[in-house]
A protein has these predicted regions:
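A generic transmembrane alpha-helix motif of multi-pass inner-membrane proteins
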Residues: 1-23, 430, 435-516
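Membrane-interface "cap" regions at the ends of multi-pass membrane proteins
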Residues: 1-63, 176-179, 204, 211, ...
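Loop-to-helix junctions at membrane interfaces in multi-pass transport proteins
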Residues: 2-5, 38-43, 47, 64-81, ...
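Residue-level recognition of pore/gate-forming positions within transmembrane alpha-helices
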Residues: 16-19, 55-56, 83-87, 134-135, ...
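Alpha-helical transmembrane segments of multipass membrane proteins
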Residues: 20, 152, 156, 170-177, ...
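Short, Lys/Arg-enriched, Gly/Pro-containing loop segments at transmembrane-helix junctions
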Residues: 32-37, 103-107, 214-219, 407, ...
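Helix-loop-helix junctions that connect adjacent transmembrane helices in secondary transporters/permeases
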Residues: 70-178, 265-410, 512-516
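Membrane-helix interface "capping/anchor" motifs
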Residues: 179-188, 428-440
Length: 516
């Protein structure tokens, strides 16, 4: 093995060992299911913000997004614009009110439990519908993260993809299984800092190594016309993007309102004061990271010779790090640390997804429906067993090395966003929303995405293929419309439900003394 490879391996070993130590440290502190899933609602602003954003962006930000821009031009940047808009709106209009409402709604620990308590669902319809949607779409989402980890190890060390996939899955499972929510949040905080350092530093160094005057010529030499490639209103071939193309890309913003692994961070923040701090930190981190993720692709076009094939474009950041630190600067250990930044992005999402899926099974299905009188320690044991089971299923889904990270994330993002985004917003801001409307919204959002993306028409194409419109936009609209129509056509909310809504709106009787 080359010395460069040995130093990179040493960096990875230190990093992975550190994550496992954090998990072990928090294992003794995790004594109940509330500790395991929400950390006792004790997150400070910095940890909440960076863990939320790190779990949001995942390996997609450092592999999927740069890969899409690298292969298909800066017209893909509209996705990043949509994500930034969604992040800002989520922190601005959802974070504080959702935290207050989950406290007011019988101290709800999970998103399905919040919806059950918010709508006084005595028959557990919302609980079951929501839990099923989370399990289905999060299995795909978790698989995308594990797949990204496998591809990372495979690209760097040349080890068989399945072996790489196994290593990544075991480490992520290890600290999530041991430490639960607080271990996940603390590791995500560290990983968020590492991601930011890597995404900013590497493209800047590569840009100066290329030289500003050579960028345009090098991009053209890579096989694309630079003026077309750098026009955000064009695709890589110079064709003008249609309105549907741009709407579909901006439509990624809608997903934020329904992402359980992000929303659970809002629920766990220690106070309204910390919510306000988290908003600023989270939005600034997101803006910087997304801008530089796109910059990685543009600089990569000019810096990497020969150009990467489109089916290898998701490796652009990996290739840049290796070239910068193994050849041009000669600091392979530092390069290994920055490669750990990609692993950090992957792990920070996979761990959160494992935890949310496990909470849906153990807390929402087992504890609420099967064994409501089970002791907290038994629920905690079931939670850990569920984490293991979910990881195994996601691992099986991820075994195909040809699966696209961007494609897997896109499908899961649409499913979760359409299922939960509309009902979260309406539950927080529309007083008239009732149980029937909520159930119709979650079910129709999930089904719309499945039909749009997976049910073929007569010619073999899906509606998504035929129209080019992102399924999230369709599913979100269908869900929102049905929530309104069904709520208006059925029984009004009870007086207790209306009082709870007013209390949360006014910031009283909900565990806080101020609005946020």
């Amino acid at each position: 093995m080359k010395s460069d490879m040995i130093w990179t391996l040493v960096a990875f070993a230190f990093y992975l060992a550190g994550m496992l130590l954090i998990g072990a440290a928090y294992m003794k502190k995790t004594k109940s299911s509330e500790d395991f899933f929400l950390g006792g609602r004790g997150l400070n602003g910095w940890v909440a913000a960076l863990s939320a954003q790190a779990s949001d962006m995942s390996g997609w930000m450092l592999m999927g997004l740069p890969g899409a821009v690298y292969a298909f031009g800066t017209g893909q940047i509209w996705i990043a614009v949509g994500l930034l808009i969604g992040t800002i709106l989520n922190w601005a209009i959802v974070s504080g009110r959702l935290r207050r409402y989950t406290i007011r709604a019988n101290n709800s620990l999970t998103l399905p439990k919040y919806l059950e308590n918010r709508f006084e669902d005595k028959h557990k319809i919302m609980l079951l519908v929501s839990s099923v949607a989370i399990v289905i779409f999060f299995l795909v989402y978790t698989a995308s993260a594990l797949s990204a980890g496998g591809k990372l190890f495979n690209s760097i060390f040349g080890i068989d993809y399945k072996i790489c996939l196994t290593i990544g899955a075991v480490v992520i499972l290890g600290y999530t299984f041991m430490g639960g929510f607080m271990a996940v949040c603390v590791t995500d905080f560290v990983q968020g800092l590492l991601m930011l350092a890597g995404v900013v530093t590497i493209p800047i160094i590569a840009f100066f190594l290329v030289g500003a005057g050579n960028v345009m010529d090098n991009i053209t030499a890579s096989g694309v016309e630079a003026h077309h490639y750098l026009n955000i209103f064009n695709d890589e071939k110079g064709q003008t993007l249609s309105a549907i193309d741009i709407i579909s890309k901006l439509g990624w913003a809608l997903g934020y309102f329904g992402m359980p692994h992000i929303l659970v961070r809002f629920m766990a923040i220690s106070s309204q004061k910390e919510v306000k701090k988290s908003r600023v930190i989270g939005c600034v981190w997101c803006a910087i990271s997304l801008c530089f993720a796109c910059f990685i692709a543009i600089v990569g076009r000019a810096y990497l010779v020969p150009a990467l094939a489109n089916n290898k474009s998701e490796n652009v950041f990996i290739e840049m790090i290796q070239k910068v630190y193994n050849s041009d600067i000669g600091l392979p250990f530092v390069g290994g640390i920055f490669l750990c930044g990609i692993l950090a992005a992957i792990m920070s999402t996979a761990d959160s997804q494992l935890l949310v899926t496990a909470s849906s099974v153990s807390e929402d299905i087992y504890h609420s429906c099967i064994a409501p009188k089970a002791e907290s320690k038994k629920v905690l044991l079931v939670s850990r067993i569920t984490v293991l089971a979910v990881a195994v299923v996601a691992y099986i889904i991820a075994l195909d090395p040809k699966s696209s990270i961007m494609g897997l994330v896109s499908n899961a993002w649409a499913g979760l966003g359409a299922s939960f985004g509309p009902i979260i917003l309406m539950s927080l801001y529309w007083r008239r929303t009732n149980l029937a409307g909520a159930a119709a919204g979650v079910a129709s959002g999930a089904l719309s995405v499945i039909i749009w993306d997976y049910i073929p028409l007569a010619g073999g194409q899906t509606l998504g293929d035929k129209t080019g419109l992102y399924s999230l936009v369709v599913g979100f609209a269908v869900s929102l419309i049905l929530i309104i129509i069904v709520s208006l056509c059925t029984k009004k909310p009870s007086e207790e439900m209306l009082k709870a809504f007013d209390d949360v709106k006014n910031g009283v009787n909900c565990g806080c003394d101020e609005k946020a």
